[in-house]
């Protein structure tokens, strides 16, 4: 089993959800997160007014950008399909498209039934 973690733009959440559901993956977690990559700023990504832009420039800081984090655990043969689907929906070729991480999952347990492994998915 693997956990696929994707950080995407909020505006792409519905399309991503719809594609995953259409492929047979309706179960996942989605969380509102704040973050940034290596870029210093993303023009037009957010419209949150800064209380003091001069201070931001002087300190060299950057506010974090609102994103969505999707976490979905799938069986090994399904990883490529899920990753490709997320990539297809979210790829624009522009800074801020997001990131995808694939992590190993040793075990899973369904609390209600006690099912383990892939049966718990």
UniProtKB/Swiss-Prot annotation:
Keyword Transmembrane helix: no
Keyword Transcription regulation: yes
GO biological process: nitrogen fixation; regulation of nitrogen utilization
Family of this protein: Belongs to the P(II) protein family.
InterPro entries according to UniProt: N-reg_PII, N-reg_PII-like_a/b, N-reg_PII/ATP_PRibTrfase_C, N-reg_PII_CS
Protein known as: Nitrogen fixation nifHD region GlnB-like protein 2
Pfam families hit by this protein: P-II
Top-level taxon of origin: Archaea
Record keywords: Nitrogen fixation, Transcription, Transcription regulation
UniProt GO MF annotations: ATP binding; enzyme regulator activity
One GO cellular component term noted in the UniProt record for this chain: cytosol
Function recorded in the entry: Could be involved in the regulation of nitrogen fixation.
């Amino acid at each position: 089993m693997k956990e696929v973690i994707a950080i995407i733009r909020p505006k792409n959440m519905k399309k991503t959800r719809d594609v995953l559901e259409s492929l047979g993956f309706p179960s996942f977690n989605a969380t509102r997160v704040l973050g940034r990559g290596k870029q210093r700023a993303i023009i037009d990504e957010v419209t949150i007014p800064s209380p003091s832009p001069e201070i931001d420039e002087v300190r060299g800081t950057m506010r974090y950008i609102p994103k969505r984090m999707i976490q979905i655990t799938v069986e090994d043969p399904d990883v490529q399909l899920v990753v490709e689907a997320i990539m297809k929906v979210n790829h624009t070729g522009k800074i801020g498209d997001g990131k995808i991480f694939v992590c190993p999952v040793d075990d899973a347990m369904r609390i209600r039934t006690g099912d383990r492994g892939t049966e718990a998915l």
